[in-house]
């Protein structure tokens, strides 16, 4: 066999997983619906707002298989980077390089992968083809697809909506967008699902104790959501603790226990460093309570913190830029809020006789030491 020059590029379409129980995505780049939110500005109309915060993880280099034939990394089911990139382009600007996480561009879309066999939670696929941007190289795509669960067979859910109502959320593409999305979610939930709502600005407040989503209660729940207003500073850490306390109080054994945090990530009261907040969610995740993070807005978007909170909180991170994205998250791909596999890791071993070198595309902040693959105590990504 002729040895491939330099590369068998590893392109893990683990992102395929992100769509696991969802219908195919057919969403286009959409403006906000007339009369509800303003249309997107014309290219260049909105000035650059430099307050967004990203972490630049660099780019994975080529690795010689003679020196390190094994590639090990955690799965990642976030999709925020793609819709955030779309927001930048719709505003006539290029996104910062640090805002681009390639694996999340794949996660955003649904791929036509085979369903898992009976009795299995995931299915594995792979493809190898000529690399379209480098002649003589090969591109390998790995696919992992989670088990599809019909809505009527989803386990009961204990949701705690944790909503940022601080002054920074007053922009029309922040709190109002989240309120619309959460109302959509209420409409599709079942009587076996419960919702509690915690809000925070200068202080946290429980505005709705855990309530069954029976039809008779849905109007009340949506009225609470509609009444929310943005004002004050941002005491996010204290509210996060309160949300975990409520989720624990109403914990559903064998169910889906999840906090959904909607914010721009601008925590400025109490614990505010990413490291301290990550330590908090790491303490809580072992109790079986997962954290989904929904980012909104621009100008002070703390993408770096929100991605780390979701990854370490056994959840996922999405960015919402328009109403079509709300429908995608809360209606068409609601199954992402249900985890079907925990602590998922991937390890690929290349034969140095056939492959000279490889490069993992994306997953720069999900790399693992090879020996961690067999370590069940090492946290990794969830499929949901």
Language-model regions, residue ranges each:
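Bacterial N-terminal signal peptides that target proteins for export
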Residues: 2-13
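Exposed acidic/Ser/Thr-rich ligand/metal-binding surfaces
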Residues: 27-33, 124-345
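C-terminal motif of bacterial Sec signal peptides marking the signal peptidase cleavage site
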Residues: 21-24
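An acidic, Ser/Thr-enriched
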Residues: 38-88, 93-99, 116-127, 132-140, ...
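Extracytoplasmic
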Residues: 96-111
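Sec-dependent signal peptide cleavage junction
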Residues: 26-44
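Short helix-loop boundary/capping segments at the starts of domains
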Residues: 12, 19, 91-95, 111-115
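Alpha-helix boundary/capping residues
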Residues: 89-92, 109-112, 228, 313, ...
